[in-house]
Amino acid sequence: MAGFRSLARQVRDPRCDLALRRYSLRKCLERFAPYGHRATWDHLCSRAGFGPEDRSPDPARLVAALEELEEARSVWLAYEVEFAERRKKEKHDGLRRPGSVDDWHRLTWGGFGVAWCDDPRVHPDESLAEVLRRLISALEREPGAVCPACDGERLVWKYELDHEPSTGPVCTECGILVPRPVLTPEALADARRGRLLVSA
């Protein structure tokens, strides 16, 4: 099974068939897809200027999509290194019980679904790297009341999401499943109440 970097080389290789280059970009999403596979693909296609079903996209657009994905991946991998170092130090200092951020991080190790978008057509407009920087920044500060990706104030509690956790606060503006550790208890309660008002 090819790794992310090997697949990225195939996307860039002009000697490869265009279908293989597109396929390799899709396979990269099996290794790293911050919004989930389908939503990340839709995001990359719209930002690079080709359709999700386009079987013959301009090779330069494929490479542009890959570059955005690679930048986001490097942001996330740097965060994971810092996270691992912090946990190692905490364990050395006797803190064996992980906190809520650590529980959330366990579910997103490797970067899959870090900013899960249940509807593949609804996702942030900004670059993947920028969204991840905002998310990481939110994880490293005190909890707030808005979406860390877009500063959206309208969060609604959704059930039966195609992700773990399968319930949680979803931003109605950018569509991400907002990590619970970045929200105050009041913001979480408001999101739940919003769900009750919507379903009533």
Which positions does each model-derived feature cover?
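Short terminal alpha-helical segments
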Residues: M1-F32, L128-L132
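Charged, low-complexity interaction regions
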Residues: R12-L20, Y35-H37, P52-S56, V114-V122
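Short, charged early-sequence alpha-helical segments and their helix-coil boundaries
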Residues: H37-V63
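Residues immediately within or flanking Cys/His clusters that coordinate Zn2+
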Residues: R141-G144, G168
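Short cysteine-rich clusters marking metal-coordination/redox-active sites
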Residues: C147-C150, C171-C174
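Short, non-ligating residues that shape and space the ligands of small metal-coordination modules
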Residues: E153-W157, R180-P181
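Short linker/helix segments within small regulatory modules
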Residues: K158-G168
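Short metal-binding segments enriched for Cys and/or His
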Residues: G175-A191
